[in-house]
Amino acid sequence: VEIALTDGGTLSAAQVNDLSVAGTANCYVVSAPGTYVFNARVRGNGAGEGVGFEPAIEMADGMTADWLWTDSEGLVSGVALDTTSGDIFLTVGEGRGNALVALMQDGKVVWSWHVWVTDAPQTMTYGNGTVFMDRNLGAAGTTAGGTDAYGMYYQWGRKDPFYGGEKTETSANAFLEAKNGTVVN
């Protein structure tokens, strides 16, 4: 079966790994280079009462898909939408990091998904039975003190992560130094 994509390319269904086969989500973990697909007809996992939005997304003319940002050069490419199936396809290269992939209608973001490329996270069970991942959400590594262990930053009320940076600030006015050049200034 050949799949026609909005960027003009085609893919064979046998070449594609389905990220949403076990269910839809706002974040997908990818652990190896390859071509991937996920269901873009559902916002997040589509569940919940009173979430304030319609979970179903209807495909329409003018819809496209692309990546909005990545913290690792060349991490994702070939992002395309199949408007017939409502699936987004992307190719993940070598390396580790994060990307934000979006479904757009006439250039405006309809919904976005965090694609986290890392070796498969492991779980750790504490003495009291609490289970955690072995890394921060979005972290490329697990080395204590290493900048690849920082992960992503989240703001209350937002589902999409922000890039965590590659260094720490230790001076007394670290906040002021960290925000220089942002919209706040």
Region locations from a protein language model:
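Surface beta-loop-beta hairpin patches that serve as ligand-binding interfaces in beta-rich domains
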Residues: V1
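Short, compositionally biased
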Residues: A4-N185
